């Protein structure tokens, strides 16, 4: 089939948007022959329906979107039913990036024993937090995990979870909370502390999911998209001022950032986490699988790697495209 002039991506969360906004607005997509349009699940958009978490797979399979960012559980479920269309093509980030903020009198993880920690209900959120606390030496049987509203519902949706979590700690509703970057910096600016937790490998944020029927019928489009994504990561890492300007304009107002320092901090942390070659790391795949799919008896007989197809990425890599981008850096 012909090359797509517009590629539509549905992002599972506003937290993916630092990269997607730069990808969309940097000119990289146009360089590779297409216009990129990005919608965000749960975020109202002018003259468009608000997409829900539950309809992501159906929207991808119907052709409404060419790619999804996220959708970490459904490909296993679909495959377990005999539907092999959903697959992951690339992974731009392989490490958990949540931050733990807390009351000003709490200075180390061990002090969280017996305390109330606000967290999200998704297995990849509360599950990673529990793992990180255990690695930090915390007896989590003594911790009360307060689950925020499910993603996209109520005042504790991911759209506003950073500022609302800071406010709840300051009101003494809870003692601590895990938040996205850069709300650890914002919390410190408002008198709270942030505790560093042990690193955890996990499939996270911008996982590129596709309908393989579409990919096989439109390989030129799929390869162009992946090459543009790879170049967008390079742009993000090497064009700091331009990337920060895009984030300040397109992302900061949506999530409640307060100042250029928070934009620059967010960019710096993301830049360090993004993979020049967006392959999934084995421990990251294993961790996500164990947190989520392994607990589902309807899908846990599917191997962790069955839903990954990185041969297009490997083809791009073997061509020397990625190495050439970074050769002079």
Regions of interest found by a model, annotated:
Residues 292-329:
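Conserved C-terminal helix/tail region of periplasmic/extracytoplasmic solute-binding proteins
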Residues 37-45, 261-273, 302-315:
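Short linear loop/turn motifs
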Residues 218-301:
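Secondary-structure end/capping motifs
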Residues 2-158, 165, 175-181, 195-200:
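Short, glycine-/small- and polar/acidic-enriched structural segments
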Residues 154-158, 162-253:
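Pocket-lining segment of extracytoplasmic ligand-binding domains
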Residues 49-52, 80-82, 101, 188-191, ...:
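Short secondary-structure transition/capping segments
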Residues 30, 34, 79, 134, ...:
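Short polybasic/polar patches that bind polyanions
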């Amino acid at each position: 089939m012909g090359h797509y002039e517009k590629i539509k991506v549905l992002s599972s969360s506003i937290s993916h948007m630092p990269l997607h906004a730069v990808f969309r607005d940097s000119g990289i997509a146009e360089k590779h022959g297409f216009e990129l349009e990005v919608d965000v699940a749960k975020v109202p958009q002018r003259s468009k329906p608000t997409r829900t978490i539950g309809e992501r797979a159906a929207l991808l399979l119907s052709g409404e979107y060419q790619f999804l960012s996220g959708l970490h559980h459904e490909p296993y479920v679909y495959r377990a039913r005999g539907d092999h269309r959903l697959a992951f093509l690339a992974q731009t980030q392989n490490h958990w990036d949540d931050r733990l903020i807390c009351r000003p009198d709490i200075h180390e993880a061990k002090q969280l024993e017996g305390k109330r920690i606000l967290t999200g209900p998704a297995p990849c959120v509360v599950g990673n937090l529990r793992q990180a606390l255990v690695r930090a030496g915390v007896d989590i049987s003594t911790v009360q995990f307060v689950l925020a509203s499910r993603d996209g519902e109520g005042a504790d949706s991911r759209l506003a979870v950073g500022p609302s979590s800071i406010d709840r700690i300051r009101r003494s509703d809870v003692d601590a909370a895990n938040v996205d970057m850069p709300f650890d910096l914002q919390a410190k600016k408002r008198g709270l502390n942030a505790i560093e937790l042990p690193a955890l490998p996990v499939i996270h944020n911008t996982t590129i999911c596709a309908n393989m029927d579409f990919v096989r019928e439109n390989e030129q489009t799929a390869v162009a998209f992946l090459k543009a994504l790879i170049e967008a990561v390079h742009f993000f890492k090497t064009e700091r001022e331009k990337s920060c300007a895009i984030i300040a304009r397109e992302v900061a107002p949506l999530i409640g950032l307060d100042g250029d320092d928070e934009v620059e901090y967010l960019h710096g942390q993301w830049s360090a986490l993004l993979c020049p070659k967006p392959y999934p790391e084995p421990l990251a795949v294993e961790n996500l699988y164990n947190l989520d799919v392994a607990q589902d008896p309807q899908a846990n007989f599917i191997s962790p790697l069955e839903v990954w197809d990185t041969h297009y990425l490997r083809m791009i890599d073997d061509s020397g495209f990625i190495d050439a981008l970074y050769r002079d850096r």
